[in-house]
């Protein structure tokens, strides 16, 4: 398993962070908090229902910064962004909680989820079952498992922990080898294909298109990274990919939800979903 240098650095720091968190709050207490958290909102179902209707199932990301691009959004109010995304038609939210490399925070996830009715994925680097229980405790409805960061045994353990606390799993792959491992190890219906090469940081939508034929029809493909314009969306929809994770394009816009609506709904003349949240 070849782990990119940047990812190695993140994972090394993440191991330290998990140890620090565990020292502050023990697992038993986190489990208690998880049991008392609001019920999961059904992340996978929210995407699957849209995709069945061949409508855009957008996971809209709330991300202040990234290691490669620096700060993406100076005016960063998670609750405000969440409401904007919901009005714009997002199916789900993704909230970065990694502190050191993405300037994220657990509080951002809590604030975003409290401001809307959408399911939320905790976007972080999961390497320990403690983090999975913690995700449920802070209100997450889904977690991300990055195949390039995990061996098969740990990946299966983390997925089992997620299932035990009622969390959905989005598994992320970058190439055919990772895809094969993911399909063999996990039964989650959500398979994310990251179009960004973690070694070079180059983005190519061909990554999704190349891997599509290898994915069983009972799995939902989520294309991640590189969706910047209407042509990108249409390229995916022609190939029957209806689930998208988009962050940077929205974070750089004055009104993230309006940009979501424009990119995925306005130019197709579709009725905007979620414009009247409960």
UniProtKB/Swiss-Prot annotation:
Catalytic activity line of the entry: 1-(2-carboxyphenylamino)-1-deoxy-D-ribulose 5-phosphate + H(+) = (1S,2R)-1-C-(indol-3-yl)glycerol 3-phosphate + CO2 + H2O
GO BP annotations listed: L-tryptophan biosynthetic process
Gene3D superfamilies named in the record: Aldolase class I
Coiled coil start-end: none
InterPro entries associated with the record: Aldolase_TIM, Indole-3-glycerol_P_synth, Indole-3-glycerol_P_synth_dom, Indole-3-GlycerolPSynthase_CS, RibuloseP-bd_barrel
Pathway listed: Amino-acid biosynthesis; L-tryptophan biosynthesis; L-tryptophan from chorismate: step 4/5
Cysteine pairs bridged by disulfides in the record: none
Protein keywords: Amino-acid biosynthesis, Aromatic amino acid biosynthesis, Decarboxylase, Lyase, Tryptophan biosynthesis
EC number annotated for this UniProt entry: 4.1.1.48
Range of residues in the leader sequence: none
Molecular function via GO: indole-3-glycerol-phosphate synthase activity; phosphoribosylanthranilate isomerase activity
Cross-referenced SUPFAM superfamilies: Ribulose-phoshate binding barrel (SSF51366)
Cross-referenced HAMAP family: IGPS_B
NCBIfam families assigned: PRK00278.1-2, PRK00278.1-6, PRK00278.2-4
Family note: Belongs to the TrpC family.
Protein name as catalogued: Indole-3-glycerol phosphate synthase
Gene behind the chain: trpC
């Amino acid at each position: 398993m070849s782990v990119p240098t940047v990812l190695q650095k993140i994972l090394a720091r993440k191991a330290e962070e998990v140890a620090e968190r565990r020292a502050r709050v023990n697992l038993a207490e986190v489990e208690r908090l998880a049991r008392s958290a609001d019920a999961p909102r059904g992340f996978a179902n929210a995407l699957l229902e849209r995709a069945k209707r061949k409508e855009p199932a957008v996971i809209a990301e709330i991300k202040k910064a990234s290691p490669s691009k620096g700060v993406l959004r100076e005016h960063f109010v998670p609750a405000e962004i969440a409401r904007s995304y919901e009005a714009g038609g997002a199916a789900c939210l993704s909230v970065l909680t990694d502190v050191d490399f993405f300037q994220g925070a657990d509080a951002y996830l809590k604030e975003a989820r409290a401001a809307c009715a959408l399911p939320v994925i905790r976007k972080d680097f999961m390497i320990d079952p403690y983090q999975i229980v913690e995700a449920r405790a802070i209100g997450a409805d889904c977690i991300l498992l990055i195949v390039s960061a995990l061996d098969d045994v740990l990946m299966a353990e983390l997925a089992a922990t997620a299932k035990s606390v009622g969390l959905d799993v989005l598994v992320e792959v970058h190439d055919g080898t990772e895809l094969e491992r993911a399909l063999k190890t996990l039964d989650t219906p959500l398979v994310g294909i990251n179009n960004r090469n973690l070694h070079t940081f180059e983005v190519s939508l061909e990554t999704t298109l190349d891997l599509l034929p290898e994915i069983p029809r009972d799995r939902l493909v989520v294309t991640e990274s590189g969706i910047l314009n209407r042509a990108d969306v249409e390229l995916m929809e022609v190939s029957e990919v209806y689930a998208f994770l988009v962050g940077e394009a929205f974070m750089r816009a004055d009104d993230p939800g309006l940009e979501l609506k424009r990119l995925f709904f306005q130019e197709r003349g579709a009725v905007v979903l979620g414009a009247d949240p409960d």
